[in-house]
Amino acid sequence: MIARIWSGESPLWRLLLPLSWLYGLVSGAIRLSYKLGFKRAWRAPVPVVVVGNLTAGGNGKTPVVIWLVEKLQQRGVRVGVVSRGYGGKAAAYPLLLTPETTTAEAGDEPVLIYQRTGAPVAVAPERAAAVKAILAAHNVQIIITDDGLQHYRLARDIEIVVIDGVRRFGNGWWLPAGPMRERASRLKTVDAAIVNGGVARAGEIPMQLAPGLAVNLRTGARCDVAQLSNIVAMAGIGHPPRFFATLEACGAHPQKCVPLADHQTLSPADVQALVGEGQTLVMTEKDAVKCRAFAEDNWWFLPVDARLSGEQPDKLLEHITSLVR
């Protein structure tokens, strides 16, 4: 229903317009207060790059963060990552991730980024506190913040927006009548707009999510996902249909697709109930970090990597690297 409202297919969005105007006024006033100097943002002693969204819902932001961290690491840059840690609840903040940190403490995306990149990761509702924790513990040269485009309390040097190339901005309205956290005109002020799927427009960087081999959660064995049989697909991400479409494009045809809420807490019983005898469970890598501790033999995940096209990605990386002292 939310997807139909935000796309404009359902007329119910009109009933939510008063709340959207209120959201827009409040969010606009907050941004203006920082722009005019009524509120002061905290500036880190190292460059800060924000990777965020203009819309609610999954746009492919986390794969972009991983891509950016890995590319900078390849250039010899020491990178730290901060996040709000949505979906997790730590005993105390800021929380510096370790190999023992769980998704229940830090949230699924920070744990995934930590496991994939090996970069220092810290989470805190107040992102400046997370930055300070990383700087106190690690000699990093640059901070990447996973989400937080609208978190103006943290000053930033580079802003990158990730856009769903198929859904783009829906009906164009602020939350809750539409998907917008800020108006599309905000794109004029960011340093780069990366478009996940669909058709990129002039000045935007095209991106595709490239699937790899399916990985068994228990053994680490790898195989072409199309070789798996009797698949039940599970996706607890911002936009589950994208994952299901990826499986179909890979030649895997699930018998059942189970969309879950983004950041949904998963118990062993919850997941086991999805799979019948003789069936194979295939999930996203983000779900896998939550399920690995209680995984069964027939559970697999499909990793994806961000692939950015054209000359702009290299120019963006050069620009970011030039900020590092």
Swiss-Prot record:
Its EC number is 2.7.1.130. It holds the Pfam family LpxK. Keywords: ATP-binding, Kinase, Lipid A biosynthesis, Lipid biosynthesis, Lipid metabolism, Nucleotide-binding, Transferase. It is an enzyme of class 2 (transferase). Belongs to the LpxK family. HAMAP family: LpxK. This is Tetraacyldisaccharide 4'-kinase. The gene is lpxK.
